[in-house]
Amino acid sequence: MKKLKINYLFIGILALLLAVALWPSIPWFGKADNRIAAIQARGELRVSTIHTPLTYNEINGKPFGLDYELAKQFADYLGVKLKVTVRQNISQLFDDLDNGNADLLAAGLVYNSERVKNYQPGPTYYSVSQQLVYKVGQYRPRTLGNLTAEQLTVAPGHVVVNDLQTLKETKFPELSWKVDDKKGSAELMEDVIEGKLDYTIADSVAISLFQRVHPELAVALDITDEQPVTWFSPLDGDNTLSAALLDFFNEMNEDGTLARIEEKYLGHGDDFDYVDTRTFLRAVDAVLPQLKPLFEKYAEEIDWRLLAAIAYQESHWDAQATSPTGVRGMMMLTKNTAQSLGITDRTDAEQSISGGVRYLQDMMSKVPESVPENERIWFALAAYNMGYAHMQDARALTAKTKGNPDSWADVKQRLPLLSQKPYYSKLTYGYARGHEAYAYVENIRKYQISLVGYLQEKEKQATEAAMQLAQDYPAVSPTELGKEKFPFLSFLSQSSSNYLTHSPSLLFSRKGSEEKQN
């Protein structure tokens, strides 16, 4: 998958061109009859989206996601509340615009010529390619030429339908496919890994995130080159909403907010390791249930799943782990660090986890307050790995090379330079294995994404099984619900205590239509 980046140049060019076209609509505040005035009079910005790990999701009842966060900030920018409507597929999103039920579509939608004929695009903010996926171990097609409608299914409203039609007309006359009117791309990817479907097509970012939980999903081939992603609004003579979006994105670009949000949601990297991910998820099943109580007990200010990811990166959850350099235990502490923390046995899992958390908290306390709250943990983890003094050097080097020392996106790019003599020779604390610190933090982020998604998949499976049980035995009395007669209850009880988070929604769940007020 190609590297993702916010298309700042495209935003700038688009802003310049549209500013001229939209000049009669600027300033857009204060006009009596326009879309912005209607939104402000209503007191809410109506945004339709789809439920995916990237666009919109909930953890512990709190919404998050790249498109959600941008939409929330845009609503704040306009001085109104955000009303989010979650749809099942892309086709339903555009129905909302057509029926006047949404002001904006914020759902990772690709900019293409067919869509802009009928809808107004906004600035682009990252890019994706469309890819054909299959299940590992099944036949991998090397071309689209021989695929049939029995093999290939795509989601309704998917942008790739236009590309498939063009390929059929120009290159692959035998190519055929079908459109599932009810399922979105995430559901179709689930069908592929469950063996219900041979192939489907999804965007590269969605696939990358899906693979963190389902490593058996594999990419067969690219269907398109990179395509810009944008928001859409109604296309008519009123350009006030478009003008407001341009102003908003330009402001976000200039003050660095856009880059920070990109790093938050897209900064986990796009390199997927099938073996490593599969090994990690097997450890989640086999080892994590025994360690979870300790992670929950000592996590304190950080998410216990992040703490678990840190411990896995350190030792693969092996309390007896020892490195050639002498660091030992679950959190791989040095002898001196362990002594300073009062740890008497580094191979005792509880002592190691407790000490590791305290050491990490010490690193967190040293991170300057100028660093945004949601990025402080990454600075602290890099310091945990290579020492805080070298983190100071990394921030200083970032400032010297015209980057932002308070931005993790900028600082992490300079970390590998700490091992290069032209750079470390001029730094206060000298040489450091900055490339290792970079990989260390990136790996932890990937493990955290996999863990959160996988645990929520377990919750979904348990919930669906419980619902099926209720349907199968609607009139069973409590006295009949013995574990011998209904062994699933034993599994459900164990799952609830060993695996499940208490999040009411699922990172990779199948969602229908719902509305959220923010």
UniProtKB/Swiss-Prot annotation:
Family under the similarity heading: In the N-terminal section; belongs to the bacterial solute-binding protein 3 family.
Chief location of this protein within or outside the cell: membrane
Domain of life according to the entry: Bacteria
InterPro entries, sorted: Lysozyme-like_dom_sf, MltF, Solute-binding_3/MltF_N, Transglyc_AS, Transglycosylase_SLT_dom_1
Free-text note on domains in this protein's UniProt record: The N-terminal domain does not have lytic activity and probably modulates enzymatic activity. The C-terminal domain is the catalytic active domain.
Stretches the record annotates as Non-LT domain: 22-269
Active site (record annotation): 314
EC number: 4.2.2.n1
GO BP annotations listed: cell wall macromolecule catabolic process; cell wall organization; peptidoglycan catabolic process
Entry GO MF terms: peptidoglycan lytic transglycosylase activity
PROSITE patterns, per database record: TRANSGLYCOSYLASE
Function noted in UniProt: Murein-degrading enzyme that degrades murein glycan strands and insoluble, high-molecular weight murein sacculi, with the concomitant formation of a 1,6-anhydromuramoyl product. Lytic transglycosylases (LTs) play an integral role in the metabolism of the peptidoglycan (PG) sacculus. Their lytic action creates space within the PG sacculus to allow for its expansion as well as for the insertion of various structures such as secretion systems and flagella.
Subcellular location: Cell outer membrane
Region (LT domain): 270-518
Protein name from the UniProt record: Membrane-bound lytic murein transglycosylase F
Enzyme category, top tier: lyase
GO annotation, cellular component aspect: cell outer membrane
Catalysis performed (reactions): Exolytic cleavage of the (1->4)-beta-glycosidic linkage between N-acetylmuramic acid (MurNAc) and N-acetylglucosamine (GlcNAc) residues in peptidoglycan, from either the reducing or the non-reducing ends of the peptidoglycan chains, with concomitant formation of a 1,6-anhydrobond in the MurNAc residue
